[in-house]
Every structure is written in C-alpha cells, then in structure tokens.
Amino acid sequence: MKANKLTAIAMLLAALFFATPKAKAQVNAQVLYDFGSDREFVTLTLEMFKQDKWGNTYFFVDHDFNYDQHVKGSPNLAPGGTYFEIARCLNFWQNSSIKNLSLHVEYNGGITRSYPINNAWLVGVDYFIHSKDFKNTLNLKALYKNIQEKDSDVPMQLTAVWAMNDLFGVKGLKFDGFADFWWETHGVDFREDGTCDTKKTVFITEPQLWYNVGQHFGCYNLSLGGEVELSNNFGSTGGFKCRPCLGVKWDF
C-alpha cells in the first residue's frame, strides 16, 4: 500500500511539473564564492524557469564544495552538500480577471555529508505583480508547509520573489532575489556535549546583483556580480548572519 501511494504521488507530481505545453526555458549556472566566516567555499547553482500556457515551472540545484569541512583532514574531493527545490505555479485562467493569482506546489530537500535536509512539501497561492513592460516583477506566496519528521507551531511559509531589470536605467544591471519566512522547531548552536538551543522560526533572504559584462564584447551570456545571504536561525546557526558572495553567471 505504501509503495502504491508513493507511486501515485510521483505520477501526480510528474503530471504537474512536466506534462505541459512546450515553451522556451530560461536556464543559468552560477558559481559563487561565499565569504562568510563560517563558510568560505564555492557553490555551484543550476537554475531554470519556464513559462507556459498552464503557468510556470521553476527549479534550482545547489552543490556546496565543502566536503573538507564535513570530514576534517579530508581533501575537498566532492560536494559536501546538495540542495534541490522545484515549484510549479498552476494557472488555467490566464485570460480572466484573476490571471495574476496561481496555485503553487513545491518540493524541497537535500543531503549533506553530515546531516539530511528533510523533505518538505508546500502548497498554496501565488500572486504576481509586474510593471507594464514586465521588467520589474514581484511574486508573493502564502504556502502550507509540511517538513517530514519536523514540528512547527504554524505549518506555513511566506515568500517574496522579485526581479528588476535594467536597474536605474543601466542596461544589463539586474537586481533579483527571494525572501522566505517559515515556522520550524529546530536546534541551533550545537555544543560539544550534544545540547543546543531551540528556535521556532527561520528567515532567509538572498538579494542578488548582476551586471551583464558580456554585452560589451558580444557575449550576452556572461554576467558578473554576487549575492548577500541575510538569515536568522537558518540551518543549525542561531541568530542573525550576513554572508556576502561574489561570482559569475552564465545564461544558456
């Protein structure tokens, strides 16, 4: 029975995420070095967004090249952690008065050399706001969130996603990012005796700023820039953290 249930869920998700009319996808790869005092490693991100007649699909995969931080004395011979998100906005009423409102389905999960990042399932609504020329966009989401084997006082996540193209009238300057706030009872600041502090909420935002330098020499795929991760009680770190990153982005 359990196997049949998992198969049914997998088939439903496949239908939601992949059985959609063909459309051009926006795909990019980012290589960022994290200067955070507790990080100091490289992350490779593969990101995709695809719009279609039924809504849109978004996913990203992060590979953290920090194996040596998980296994002391080991060379940095492999990613120390991988994290994956995939989300589908369903909208069958794009020609109606509520065209900016979509249903949202999402999965998050990952693994590190030291600990798992538990499966999370999210469902809710997304509201889309944009400028007339679509250069500036904002998505606001209210989502029910279930994290496997985790407790929360309020099983919800609130999300904002934004993009601003040609910022300040500068061609090729892009400011984008996201902000997430959710409830999750979790341990932070673990001590040698195994004890830790307990927190109830998590906040993280990662604003990015990119400049398309490639436009000046005929290579429009190449951008330079970075991001700043601002978080509170994120992962196993308690309190507020600011972690700046610099890197390159290639749009396929």
Question: What residue ranges belong to the model's regions?
Answer:
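Cleavable N-terminal export/targeting peptides
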Residues: 1-26
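Short loop/turn motifs that connect adjacent beta-strands in outer-membrane beta-barrel proteins
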Residues: 23-26, 54-56, 91-102, 130-138, ...
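Short glycine/proline- and aromatic-enriched beta-strand/turn motifs that initiate or cap beta-hairpins
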Residues: 23-67
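Residues that define the transmembrane beta-barrel architecture of outer-membrane proteins
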Residues: 25, 40-44, 78-84, 117-123, ...
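Transmembrane beta-strands of outer-membrane beta-barrel pores
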Residues: 31-37, 63-67, 105-113, 129, ...
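Residues on the lipid-exposed face of transmembrane beta-strands in outer-membrane beta-barrel proteins
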Residues: 46-50, 86-90, 123-129, 142-144, ...
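Outer-membrane beta-barrel translocator domains and adjoining extracellular loop/strand segments
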Residues: 70-75, 114-118, 151-153, 187-195, ...
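Outer-membrane beta-barrel transmembrane domain signature
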Residues: 145-221, 230-233, 250-252
